[in-house]
Amino acid sequence: MRRNGSYGQQILRNLVDENVNVGFVHEDLDHATGTAYVTAAHGKNAIVVVPSANYCLEPKHLENAERFFSTADLVLTQLEIPMNVVEKTYEFSKKYNKKLGIYASPAARISEEILEYASFIVAKSNELSIIFGEESREKILRKYPNKLFVRDDANSTIYHNGSEMKYHRNDPEDMPNKMGMGDAFTSGFSIALCHGNEVDDCVKFGNDVSLKVAQKRGSQTGLPRLSDFAL
């Protein structure tokens, strides 16, 4: 993660307030913090991403934090950074035999080597062709059983469990904020997986976390706490 300017300071303060270790946040003095601009029409969202400082991240910055890979329960990455940094993340995860989760957003082509190693991949339904090519959704899901989880704006998640297609949906009438739902699902899924839950339960919990975010304003401030759930 890279930061500079008021947005970056705000993000950093929020992480510190939530007791997140920011010791390896690298500040770029020449670029602003990455932003995303959202347009909404007829219930559909379109996102314009401006990576800015995120795309200044380099593999050497991960090398400075390599020792923390060995103590991680799971390594989670998105595609808001250069692909060579994603590849370095994979290399360290494999080196230390760590679970690797990928939220494939913004969508980009990912090497087969990384896809095969990943513990799970979360992708948007309308971006599968960018990541996997022009095969049908069903064929792609069957190729990655219990690994690929496909999401849409209705807070539904589809995956193949090796025997059949599975479908989970939490879609109330009131979802004022659809921004951050994918991040929330991925976070909830990751937490459940690290606690040893079965895949189906990980999906259900990810959906529940995503729903909490959708019912509030603010992709970060809307994120729930574990105490918000009856476990």
Language-model-derived ranges and their functions:
Residues 16, 94, 142:
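Anion (oxyanion) recognition and catalysis
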Residues 74-139, 155-157:
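Conserved beta-alpha-beta core of the PfkB/ribokinase-like small-molecule kinase fold
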Residues 1-73, 229-231:
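Conserved N-terminal subdomain of the carbohydrate kinase-like
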Residues 48, 131, 213:
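Residues that scaffold the ATP/ADP-binding catalytic core of kinase and kinase-like folds
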